[in-house]
Each structure stands twice: as C-alpha cells, then as structure tokens.
C-alpha cells in the first residue's frame, strides 16, 4: 500500500482503560480520545497494538460496561473510511466479534506483517514472544482454551470482571516497576525475538507494545525495533510519515 501524500500511519498501545478503576482512568481515556480526534485529520491507517482495555471479555450478548468515548470515537473514525487495525494484548485477548461487527475493525490474535511505501512492518502486542515470558506462555494457553472461556462465560459478569480487575492491580500487571526498566539489548526478549526473525527475512520495522517502555533500537540491516510505550505514564505513540517512523509524546493542546 502506498500512503497518500500528506497522510500518516499511527500506532499506539497499552492504554489499560479501566485501570485501576474506570473513574481513575477516565482522564487518560479523554486524553486518548483527544489524540484520536487530532490524528484523524491526516491518518491513512491507525494501529492499536494491544491492551487498549485493562480487561475485556465478550459474552454472547454482552460486552463490558464503559469506554463509551473510546468506542464512539473509533466508530466515527472507522465510519469515515480510515482503516483501524486492532491487535489483542494479554489484557484484552478475549475478543469475539464485537469490534468486527460493530466497528468494522479487524482484530488480530498474533503478529502480522504489513507493507507501506515498500517498507515492511512486523506488528504485534509482544506478549508471549521471544525466549522468555515462559510463565505467561503457559498461562495464555489456559486463558485461550475454549473450555476455560466457556466456563468463564457462565460466571456472572459482576464476579468475573471483579476478579480480573483485582488480579490486575494486585499483580501490578498495569505498569509495574519491572516494566519501567530497560534490561539491555541482550536481555530485552522482544529485541532478541526481532533479531531471530531477521535471520530468515528482512523487515524494516518491528513494532510492539507490552513492555510499557518507549524504545527505539537499531537492529542492523536497516531494521529497527520500536516499543510504543504506554498511555499510563508516557503517552507515546508511533507515527510513520511515508519515509521514516518515530516515537512522539502526545501533549494535549
């Protein structure tokens, strides 16, 4: 795909809307919606790269209460003809058709490659990738198991959502201290994952979230690893202008 002149591609991840409570996250949600409202002026494509919500589970006829401003703005942008792509994260992996049916937004459960202006973008949330994160990999197999999802669906939403919110805060899954530290290239497992991928095929950009830490790391071979940071502490996003990709900080006007 060639980006029209004057248009850009935007990337954001790790909003964790609803954490630690819906009331506490409302200012962050309003800031994110203001950003969406600004970028729609020149956006060719928008990528939401996981953990938009701190918890999301779609029942057969019910979705979580709240997030009206975000969902309404996404619907408006999608209806205007601007493509939006959504990658599930480890907090909102239980998508089941709502975004596709109501918002016309495709949802991806694993990394996917795109090409814009002859540059390749390898995009994913980042959870469970690379040589580490073994505990989460085991946990993800349980969470994505059809039997587990069926059993959870039979739990009353007030109970299920309450348990999920408690565990998220209790285990500091939002923005714990470990996520705020750069571990060095040799210990950043998403960097190692990207380098391993480069051994088989060249990509210009590897774009991930999950780490809650903005990073721009050159991998050699004219390839770059980008971590998008988050919308909890950093309010960072990626933007590709047709020639180069860079991280920026959103400062609301």
Where are these regions (language model features)?
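Conserved histidine-centered catalytic loops in small-molecule metabolism enzymes
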Residues: 14, 252-253
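Conserved beta-sheet core of the metallophosphoesterase superfamily
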Residues: 106-109, 122, 127, 133-139, ...
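Active-site-proximal loop/helix segment associated with metal-binding centers of metalloenzymes
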Residues: 126-189
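Conserved catalytic motifs of the protein kinase core domain
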Residues: 8, 45, 119, 204, ...
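Low-complexity, flexible helical/coil segments
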Residues: 44-51, 81-87, 121-125, 143-151, ...
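N-terminal short leaders/motifs
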Residues: 54-77, 176-203
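Core catalytic region of metal-dependent phosphoesterases/phosphodiesterases
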Residues: 2-8, 12, 17-116, 233
């Amino acid at each position: 795909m060639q980006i029209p002149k004057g248009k850009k591609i935007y990337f954001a991840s790790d909003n964790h809307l609803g954490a630690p409570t819906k009331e506490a996250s409302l200012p962050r949600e309003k800031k994110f919606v203001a950003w969406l409202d600004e970028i729609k002026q020149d956006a060719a494509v928008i990528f939401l790269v996981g953990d938009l919500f701190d918890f999301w589970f779609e029942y057969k006829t019910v979705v979580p209460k709240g997030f009206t401003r975000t969902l309404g703005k996404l619907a408006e942008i999608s209806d205007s003809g601007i493509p939006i792509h959504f990658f599930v994260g480890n907090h909102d992996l239980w998508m089941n058709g709502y975004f596709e049916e109501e918002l016309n937004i495709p949802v991806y459960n694993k990394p996917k490659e795109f090409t814009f202006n002859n540059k390749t973008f390898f995009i994913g949330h980042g959870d469970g990738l690379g040589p580490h994160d073994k505990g989460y990999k085991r946990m993800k197999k349980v969470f994505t198991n059809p039997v587990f999802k069926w059993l959870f669906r039979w739990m009353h939403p007030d109970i299920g959502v309450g348990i999920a919110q408690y565990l998220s805060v209790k285990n500091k899954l939002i923005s714990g201290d470990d996520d705020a530290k750069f571990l060095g290239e040799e210990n950043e497992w998403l960097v190692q994952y990207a380098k391993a991928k480069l051994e088989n095929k060249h990509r210009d950009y590897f774009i991930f979230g999950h780490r809650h830490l903005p990073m721009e790391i050159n991998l050699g071979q004219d390839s770059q690893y980008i971590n998008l940071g988050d919308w909890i502490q950093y309010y960072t996003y990626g933007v590709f202008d047709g020639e180069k990709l860079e991280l920026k900080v959103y400062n609301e006007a």
